């Protein structure tokens, strides 16, 4: 049961019973009616702007219309009180019986409470991480990995089919540089003294095992080949090794993709996929020969003061037209982007999400233009940019460097503070805002450490069940038993906790619609705070304790409330990819 959609329907039913509304129904936009929690909880449980948005088209005063709506709502047995505030907002306070039935429905649904049909089964392709396969993942990749994975989990919970994809950038010049770096390590494995790694090559020791494996398998044969012969062999071995390392890094973070798509497949068979994509755009009139004026500021790599084959992307929302084929006949990196999008669209995806680093901000408009041009506006593409993560230790910055070959890897962070701390904290800021990650703070056992605070709430819930079994020998209650006992939940403090649980379905849908998984982390912290606050009240008010060893019925009723809290915490934590522990030490 979704409290807010339920009362939205009830409010609209009440409106349909008003003569003036019925007379002008065709002129009214019920879609503008909002039903949500009031900003101040003391005003009620549900608030609506119905009178505010309908008064003008009805030719009446908002407060006067509110009074008429209120009269209808007072006929509802689940409404304990209803009033008008300010210029015409309507605040509704719900009856205890409604909260009890809602609690029973939460208990009945368990970890499926809050699941939505919002997506209506539509499949979304979420592409995230897509780090160049040039080495182990560093902490900079971590945020995009977590945001993309949590978003995919959220969309699945909201009723979407989801495919998680990783785009392997294995066709660019950086792969040639990587292969030459590995070939140097291969020569080293053969016993050659290579000295200092030349500037421009990858210096990391993580390439040593790849060189050793080539030496073991090929001996000196590669050494005696010209570069054009050994290059494809070394490339294949290196990319396989790097992607195996990246998969292990992602698994340590509990990130698993459905598809790993190789950029090289777009260049296979004479770049057939790229040629086809350009031909399709040509047929639609989006491709022409021309020379672009030099852009202001730093020149992009694909700019030439010569005639090129260009995508008329300004016609579909971009700032400038984009080169597809250079003057020498080679394809630009952007041409591969076009072919990749077409590949996704041809696979049947009409909704696609790209989770990219903040350094890709300049790609947003061109990717959106590609989506419009390739799909004729049928596909929806969203680009989410993840801002930088800054590492600290006790407030002091932690330096990270990749050029030197000595840098903070994703695995380093996970091994030091744990997967759960990394995942939850990467979601504890909106992806578009910079994130400070302090190794000391995320391992504190305090309210100031969100992941500990939320997980501790779940562990406390589980401890209540253990306490109940100690207090009442042989106590074994099913969710069905707990749902039948909700009449024992009537204290205002308990009902406030139910009200917080009632927000979860709305949070799920709003977070999915806005593609903001951080909202789940924020909500979980708020729910944990409400639960801990209620727990602490029991210290001073014994009548509010979850377990009353002298009252079995009261205990069972409150176990139902605890079960509901634990269920929502568990499903919310699952969306974030974080464990819900039964015990914490």
Curated annotation (Swiss-Prot):
The keyword Cytoplasm belongs to this UniProt entry's keyword annotation: yes
- Keywords, in A-Z order: Aminoacyl-tRNA synthetase, ATP-binding, Cytoplasm, Ligase, Nucleotide-binding, Protein biosynthesis
Pfam families reported in the protein's UniProt record: Arg_tRNA_synt_N, DALR_1, tRNA-synt_1d
What PROSITE patterns does the record tag this protein with? AA_TRNA_LIGASE_I
Q: Where is this motif: 'HIGH' region?
A: 131-141
Q: What class of enzyme is it?
A: ligase
GO biological process annotations for this chain's record?
A: arginyl-tRNA aminoacylation
Source species? Rhizobium etli (strain ATCC 51251 / DSM 11541 / JCM 21823 / NBRC 15573 / CFN 42)
> What is a single molecular function from GO for this protein?
arginine-tRNA ligase activity
Catalytic activities: tRNA(Arg) + L-arginine + ATP = L-arginyl-tRNA(Arg) + AMP + diphosphate
For this protein, the record's HAMAP family field holds:
Arg_tRNA_synth
Instruction: Tell me the NCBIfam families matching this sequence.
Output: argS
Gene3D superfamilies xrefs: Arginyl tRNA synthetase N-terminal domain, HUPs, Isoleucyl-tRNA Synthetase, Domain 1
What does the subunit section of this Swiss-Prot or TrEMBL entry state?
Monomer.
Disulphide bonds annotated for this chain are: none
EC id: 6.1.1.19
Which superkingdom does the taxonomy of this entry point to?
Answer: Bacteria
The UniProt entry's sequence similarity note says: Belongs to the class-I aminoacyl-tRNA synthetase family.
* Subcellular location as annotated: Cytoplasm
Instruction: State the protein's name.
Output: Arginine--tRNA ligase
| Cellular component GO terms held in the UniProt record | cytoplasm
Tagged with keyword Magnesium: no
């Amino acid at each position: 049961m979704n409290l807010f959609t339920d009362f939205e329907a009830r409010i609209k039913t009440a409106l349909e019973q008003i003569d003036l509304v019925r007379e002008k129904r065709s002129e009214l936009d019920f879609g503008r009616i909002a039903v949500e929690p009031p900003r101040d909880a003391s005003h009620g449980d549900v608030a609506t702007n119905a009178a505010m948005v309908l008064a003008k088209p009805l030719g009446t005063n908002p407060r006067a219309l509110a009074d008429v709506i209120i009269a209808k709502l007072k006929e509802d047995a689940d409404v304990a009180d209803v009033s008008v505030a300010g210029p015409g907002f309507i605040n509704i306070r719900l009856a205890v019986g409604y909260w009890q039935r809602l609690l029973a429905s939460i208990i009945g649904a368990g970890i499926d409470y809050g699941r939505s049909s919002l997506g209506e089964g539509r499949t979304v392709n979420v592409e995230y991480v897509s780090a160049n396969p040039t080495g182990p993942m560093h902490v900079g990749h971590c945020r995009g990995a977590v945001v993309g994975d949590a978003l995919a989990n959220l969309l699945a919970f909201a009723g979407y089919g989801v495919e998680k994809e990783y785009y392997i950038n294995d066709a660019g010049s950086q792969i040639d540089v990587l292969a030459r770096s590995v070939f140097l390590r291969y020569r080293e494995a053969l016993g050659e003294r290579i000295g200092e790694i030349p500037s421009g090559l990858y210096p990391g020791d993580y390439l040593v095992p790849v060189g050793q494996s080539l030496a073991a398998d090929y001996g000196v044969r590669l050494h005696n080949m010209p570069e054009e012969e050994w290059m494809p062999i070394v490339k294949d071995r290196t990319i396989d090794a790097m992607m195996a390392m990246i998969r292990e890094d992602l698994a340590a973070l509990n990130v698993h993709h459905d598809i790993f798509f190789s950029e090289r497949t777009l260049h296979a068979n004479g770049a057939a996929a790229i040629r086809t994509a350009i031909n399709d755009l040509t047929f639609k009139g989006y491709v022409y020969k021309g020379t672009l004026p030099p852009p202001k500021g730093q020149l992009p790599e694909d700019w030439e003061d010569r005639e090129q084959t260009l995508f008329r992307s300004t016609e579909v929302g971009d700032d400038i037209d984009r080169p597809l084929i250079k003057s020498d006949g080679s394809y630009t990196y952007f041409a591969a982007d076009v072919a990749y999008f077409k590949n996704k669209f041809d696979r049947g995806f009409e909704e696609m999400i790209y989770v990219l680093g903040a350094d890709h901000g300049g790609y947003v408009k061109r990717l959106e233009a590609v989506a419009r041009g390739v799909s004729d506006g049928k596909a929806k593409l969203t680009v989410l940019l993840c801002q930088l993560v800054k590492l600290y230790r006790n407030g002091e910055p932690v330096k990270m460097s990749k050029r030197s070959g000595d840098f903070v890897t994703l695995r380093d962070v996970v091994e030091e503070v744990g997967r759960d701390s990394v995942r939850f904290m990467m979601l504890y800021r909106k992806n578009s805002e910079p994130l400070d990650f302090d190794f000391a703070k995320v391992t504190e056992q305090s309210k100031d450490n969100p992941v500990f605070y939320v997980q501790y709430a779940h562990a406390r819930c589980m401890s209540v069940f253990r306490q109940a079994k100690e207090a009442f020998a042989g106590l074994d209650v099913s969710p069905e038993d707990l749902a039948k006992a909700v009449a024992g939940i009537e204290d205002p403090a308990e009902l406030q906790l139910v009200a917080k649980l009632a927000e979860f379905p709305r949070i799920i849908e709003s977070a999915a619609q806005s593609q903001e998984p951080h909202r789940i982390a924020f909500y979980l912290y708020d729910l944990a705070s409400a639960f801990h606050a209620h727990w602490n009240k029991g210290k001073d008010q014994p009548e509010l304790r979850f377990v009353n060893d002298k009252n079995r019925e009261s205990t069972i009723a409150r176990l139902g409330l605890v079960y509901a809290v634990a269920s929502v915490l568990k499903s919310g934590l699952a969306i974030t990819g974080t464990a819900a522990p039964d015990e914490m030490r």
